[in-house]
Structure formats: structure tokens, C-alpha cells
Swiss-Prot record:
Belongs to the ABC transporter superfamily. Phosphate importer (TC 3.A.1.7) family. It comes from the Bacteria. It is an enzyme of class 7 (translocase). Its EC number is 7.3.2.1. SUPFAM superfamilies: P-loop containing nucleoside triphosphate hydrolases. GO terms for biological process: phosphate ion transmembrane transport. The complex is composed of two ATP-binding proteins (PstB), two transmembrane proteins (PstC and PstA) and a solute-binding protein (PstS). SMART domains: AAA (SM00382). Its main location: membrane. Residues 12-253 form the ABC transporter domain. This is Phosphate import ATP-binding protein PstB. Part of the ABC transporter complex PstSACB involved in phosphate import. Responsible for energy coupling to the transport system. It is a peripheral membrane protein.
């Protein structure tokens, strides 16, 4: 297992992280560094804690009562888990795209502009440029440029997910979290999302949770295997899939477990 606790070029550093649903200890003493401008994938069986861990990175768990995190999550050295940290700024810096496409009930244009308006005051011309820029980043602009004022819900499932990614990058975050972004999509849409992830890492630090191990192998630079709330192994994706250090990791990857 690679020692990533003090990795160079770390964008996020997780130190002694524990997470609780009420009294249930869901994540146990996780320590890891997530490198800047790389794609890090979390794999593991259902209920292992990978999506829970992802939601600690932008404190999304605080939307639900009885959940708490202990330890440190450092973004460029700043602990995101302290009460002094502005949660709206955290979510501007650490964007999130969910498993099911969740376009807002408004136009394609306003889906992109909505978050930008919360943090910036742009002129109409500047906002038009930002909307085009974000949709282009999500490889969606050419498909929707003539129907920006139609509902986001009028798009196909794959287009809706790319709209959600565009919405996430529009506020120019530093980290983009993707929680099973392709699980509800067909193979063609999935391939487009995977191509997009490869492009996004040049400007963002990308963290993805996936049940699809082939997707993790294709898309990620680093892979973390979780089991029962513990980080079992974490290292370069090629190493994890070709020569894992732990038998538990090998058993999961080869289908003997999970």
C-alpha cells in the first residue's frame, strides 16, 4: 500500500477521519492524500463507506441530522471540518455531481447561471460567456446552444448528467466530486462522461465513486479500496489492479468477493 499520507502535490489531505450515523461508526480512521489534477476513484462493495466519505469532503452530510465527522480534511492546508469555515464557500470550492441527474426545474441557461449568481456579480454578457464556457467544458454546448431556454429536464439522461457537471464547473471549483455519475446511464453516455473526466482533470482535482471496476481502471490515476468503513488499500491505479498489496483487494477486484 502506497504511503499517501504525505504525498506531494496533495490537494486534499484526510487525517484521522471518523464518521458516525448517530452511534454507528461508518468510517474508521481514514488517512490519505488526494493529488491535485488527478482522478482518484473509490471502489468497494455496497455499504463500505465510499459515498459517505465523498460527502465529508464538502460537508454534504450536514444536511441530515445525527451525522457527524471527526478528524481533519485539509484543502490546500485549510481544515474544512471546522465550524469557522464558511460552508457555502466549501461547496463553491468542492463541487459535487450525484448518481442520478438532478437538473433544476428551470432552463438550461439558468441551470448554469444559478450557482454563479450566488457567488459572483456578472454582466449579461459575462454570464453568457460563463454559460457557454461551462457547457463547453461538459462537452454539451454544441448539443444545446440553440435551445438554452428550454427546460433542463427536456434533455436525455446522459445530457442531463453533463448539464449537472457543467453546473458544477461553472462556479470554478477546485475539486469535483462525482458519486456514481454513470450508474443510471447507457454505455454511449457513459463513454462520453468518461472522456469528459479525462479532460476535466487538467483543470480540476476529480474524485469519483464507482461500482464499476473497469470504469475505475479506465478513468483514474489512483484507486482506493474501501471495506466496512476502512481504507484497505490506496495507490496508483495500475498497481492496485495489476499487483495489489493486500489479498482483500485482489479478491474484490477479481470477483472472488463483494
Amino acid at each position: 500500500m502506497e504511503n499517501t499520507a504525505t504525498a506531494p502535490n496533495a490537494k486534499l489531505e484526510v487525517k484521522n477521519l471518523n464518521f458516525y450515523y448517530g452511534k454507528f461508526h461508518a468510517i474508521r480512521n481514514v488517512n490519505m492524500s488526494i493529488r491535485e489534477n488527478k482522478v482518484t476513484a473509490f471502489i468497494g462493495p455496497s455499504g463500505c463507506g465510499k459515498s459517505t466519505l465523498l460527502r465529508t469532503f464538502n460537508r454534504m452530510f450536514e444536511l441530515y441530522p445525527g451525522q457527524r465527522a471527526e478528524g481533519e480534511i485539509l484543502l490546500d492546508g485549510e481544515n474544512l471540518l471546522t465550524s469557522k469555515t464558511d460552508i457555502s464557500l466549501i461547496r463553491a470550492k468542492v463541487g459535487m455531481v450525484f448518481q442520478k441527474p438532478t437538473p433544476f426545474p428551470m432552463s438550461i441557461y439558468d441551470n448554469i447561471a444559478f450557482g454563479v449568481r450566488l457567488f459572483e456579480r456578472l454582466s449579461k454578457g459575462e454570464m453568457d460567456e460563463r454559460v457557454e464556457w461551462a457547457l463547453s467544458k461538459a462537452a454539451l454546448w454544441n448539443e444545446v446552444k440553440d435551445k438554452l431556454h428550454q427546460s433542463g429536464n427536456s434533455l436525455s439522461g446522459g445530457q442531463q448528467q453533463r448539464l449537472c457537471i457543467a453546473r458544477g464547473v461553472a462556479i470554478k471549483p477546485e475539486v469535483l466530486l462525482l458519486d456514481e455519475p454513470c450508474s443510471a446511464l447507457d454505455p454511449i453516455s457513459t463513454a462520453k462522461i468518461e472522456e469528459l473526466i479525462a479532460e476535466l482533470k487538467h483543470e480540476y482535482t476529480v474524485v469519483i465513486v464507482t461500482h464499476n471496476m473497469q470504469q475505475a481502471a479506465r478513468c483514474s490515476d489512483y484507486t482506493a479500496y474501501m471495506y466496512l468503513g476502512e481504507l484497505m488499500e490506496y495507490g496508483a491505479t495500475d498497481q492496485i489492479f495489476v499487483k495489489p498489496a493486500r489479498k482483500e483487494t485482489e479478491d474484490y477486484i477479481t470477483g472472488r468477493f463483494g
